[in-house]
Amino acid sequence: MVSIAFYGGIPGGISTPITQQSEKSKCEENTMFQPYCYNNDSKNSMAESKEARDQEMNLKEESKEEKRRNDWWKIGMFLLCLAGTTGGILWWYEGLPQQHYIGLVAIGGRLNGSGQSNAIECWGSFPGCRPFQNYFSYETNRSIHMNNNTATLLEAYHREITFIYKSSCTDSDHCQEYQCKKVNLNSSDSSNSVRVEDVTNTAEYWGFKWLECNQTENFKTILVPENEMVNINDTDTWIPKGCNETWARVKRCPIDILYGIHPIRLCVQPPFFLVQEKGIADTSRIGNCGPTIFLGVLEDNKGVVRGDYTACNVRRLNINRKDYTGMYQVPIFYTCTFTNITSCNSEPIISVIMYETNQVQYLLCNNNNSNNYNCVVQSFGVIGQAHLELPRPNKRIRNQSFNQYNCSINNKTELETWKLVNTSGITPLPISSEANTGLIRHKRDFGISAIVAAIVAATAIARSATMSYVALTEVNKIMEVQNHTFEVENSTLNGMDLIERQIKILYAMILQTHADVQLLKERQQVEETFNLIGCIERTHVFCHTGHPWNMSWGHLNESTQWDDWVSKMEDLNQEILTTLHGARNNLAQSMITFNTPDSIAQFGKDLWSHIGNWIPGLGASIIKYIVMFLLIYLLLTSSPKILRALWKVTSGAGSSGGRYLKKKFHHKHASREDTWDQAQHNIHLAGVTGGSGDKYYKQKYSRNDWNGESEEYNRRPKSWVKSIEAFGESYISEKTKGEISQPGAAINEHKNGSGGNNPHQGSLDLEIRSEGGNIYDCCIKAQEGTLAIPCCGFPLWLFWGLVIIVGRIAGYGLRGLAVIIRICIRGLNLIFEIIRKMLDYIGRALNPGTSHVSMPQYV
């Protein structure tokens, strides 16, 4: 170091040496006492000496903590937010009415996926179709009685026993379209062989013209008389006769006795008539009165005859057909002798029901001469409520085995007000989703509505409790929790089964009651009719006597059966209450088991599995995929900020929130150390300079304009210098001297986490640990203005997700509006600029700067 001294004289003053030093020397001389080194390169550098090793360790620690941020936590939080928002969307979607589902009550299955356009479905074990043994489908043109936009159970169920109404008795196997072609039957007189030939102009054989009809579905070809079929629009399509005619139900007819079918099921066609059994040995007289059998409603030119070998004989013929595949059904020919037949409208063709003890033949007969008829067995016998293929002589009725059909109303228009709610499988009974449409419940329902509501509530509580508390379950208790959950669900399912059984019994009771009422109504109508008529025609064998016709009109229900039903309902009520009690106990045990918190990722995983189970109940919906795509997009765009904030909140003392608090504590105490060092420096100056510290600071601050802590002291009154002079020595203790010699030691101790000598430091560490480690406290506390949402449960997550979505959508809308406004402004500016340039160009053209027009000069 080079030092040059100039000794000069100041008039009246003291000779002062003037030295020239380097910047480094000036900085080193003041390092011991000044808290900051005031050079132009680093005015704000702290006086405390930080070791490079500590800085490296801090950097390494921060890099390690950054690497410790596991991806599973982010995935769990993302799935949790997605599941919460998706659950809200699904909750809203499941409550919407589905217009394409029409029905009253679907027990045992849904109407979804049914191949029929039906409003009511019945199954073989469902007593709603009681007392039928065989179920038939039919259509109806009769409108259901509506009262205030509501249909009662019996009217909607459409089982008015013995009620006469217009309908089309439709059988799914036979009353359908057939592809038919006209054929001729040719036979030689010497043999019983008949050939089937395809011709255009047909001729009669056995008194009828013939059709060869094909049923493609069953690979069956039927040879039938043309009188049995009805052509549709002059095409090759034919349907059996009677498919679109008026029918009514009656009590007794021969088919009841022979087939053993329940008496309130059959329907036949008008007008009423009676038939007499075999009279003379060789012939049977057919008339429209007689005491033996009450048949009910048949078409004109139809009669009933008891089968006898003297009345009708089978004519055995061999039908030869060239080529055919599958089954070829040929008719059975009879020759019959009937006497005293009066044909309506003098028609030659009549219909005759020929019955025996073990079989029935429905004959179509043509009168060839006086009492002789050529008859053929009809392929489509119009008997009962459906069109059945009647048995052949070699196909006798032994065990009364019939085709089974499902009963349904295939008419959407008359029950279009009924709708089913598409549920996720939780609700036991689907109900109407609209006001003023629903089942009318009365007191006789035995509290079924309350029981159903209890089952629904128990199921909803079980599922919601399972999904909510699974987030607070320890890993080692998951299996136990699932067992309790399964027990709750099993109890709920058992309760649903019991309710289903109650509903079956209830429907049977209501339908039987309705049947009894209708029997009484019809009996009253018949008695009123007989009071007007007296006796039927001239026979006087069937007259009104005022006594009930017991066997014809059926039997009323006995009280013992009704009492048995009531007792069963009471037993089921007790079983349901027991089942609900067990479900409640299992649910309480599940709540007791869920007593400790678990990871958020496990909650997200379990909740996502529940959502995945709910999604199939929605069906194929494009709205579902659009909503899920938008949710995923919004969450992906907003997840970084959410995850960053949640990371600071929930990661504990080692999280960024803890580090932030530590840094705040460090800077705060560093500030205190700097202030204390400055005060000690002032004490030293006061002791050395004798009160000239103020002048010294003024000179220093005039040369160095730094904004440190000393400015605060400069603004204070100058009296503090004297107080420091007087009491400065009391501040300088052994500990103070040690801290002056090593100003960074206390700070390093705080950094190392000792904090034993500072009570404030210890309390702060405790506060950090309590805020970082306790999950329950994060619901009511906040760190840096961020609410700890993840531990507040599913409802808060759902609300937060919806708020985020609404905010994002509003943000996108506002940004889009800003873009539109910016584009409009640019367009307007462009238009104005074009107009300005055009006007400027026109103005320049009209007013050029230099005139090229020379004016004429006159001399």
Curated annotation (Swiss-Prot):
Stretches assigned to coiled coil: 576-624, 663-699
- Please give the residue ranges the record annotates as the region Fusion peptide: 446-466
- In chain numbering, the residues marked as site (Cleavage) are 444-445, 684-685
* GO CC annotation: host cell plasma membrane; membrane; viral envelope; virion membrane
A Pfam family cross-referenced in the UniProt record is: EIAV_GP90
- Positions of region (Immunosuppression): 498-513
Could you tell me which residue ranges are on the Cytoplasmic side of the membrane?
A: 636-859
Q: Name any one GO molecular function.
A: structural molecule activity
Q: Which UniProt keywords apply?
A: Cleavage on pair of basic residues, Coiled coil, Disulfide bond, Glycoprotein, Host cell membrane, Host membrane, Host-virus interaction, Membrane, Transmembrane, Transmembrane helix, Viral attachment to host cell, Viral envelope protein, Virion, Virus entry into host cell
Q: Which residues lie on this side of the membrane: Extracellular?
A: 7-614
Q: Where are the transmembrane segments?
A: 615-635
| Modifications after synthesis and translation | Specific enzymatic cleavages in vivo yield mature proteins. Envelope glycoproteins are synthesized as an inactive precursor that is N-glycosylated and processed likely by host cell furin or by a furin-like protease in the Golgi to yield the mature SU and TM proteins. The cleavage site between SU and TM requires the minimal sequence [KR]-X-[KR]-R.
Q: Which CDD domains match?
A: HIV-1-like_HR1-HR2
Gene Ontology BP term (one)? symbiont entry into host cell
Statement: the UniProt record of this protein carries the keyword Transmembrane helix: yes
Q: Which residues form the propeptide?
A: 1-6
Q: Could you confirm whether the keyword Glycoprotein appears in this record?
A: yes
Q: Kindly list every residue the record annotates as glycosylated.
A: 40, 112, 141, 148, 186, 214, 233, 244, 340, 368, 399, 406, 411, 422, 483, 490, 550, 557
Role: The surface protein (SU) attaches the virus to the host cell by binding to its receptor. This interaction triggers the refolding of the transmembrane protein (TM) and is thought to activate its fusogenic potential by unmasking its fusion peptide. Fusion occurs at the host cell plasma membrane. The transmembrane protein (TM) acts as a class I viral fusion protein. Under the current model, the protein has at least 3 conformational states: pre-fusion native state, pre-hairpin intermediate state, and post-fusion hairpin state. During viral and target cell membrane fusion, the coiled coil regions (heptad repeats) assume a trimer-of-hairpins structure, positioning the fusion peptide in close proximity to the C-terminal region of the ectodomain. The formation of this structure appears to drive apposition and subsequent fusion of viral and target cell membranes.
Q: How does it assemble?
A: The mature envelope protein (Env) consists of a trimer of SU-TM heterodimers attached by noncovalent interactions or by a labile interchain disulfide bond.
Protein's recorded name: Envelope glycoprotein
Which species is the source of this protein?
Equine infectious anemia virus (isolate P3.2-1) (EIAV)
Task: Give the gene that encodes this protein.
Answer: env
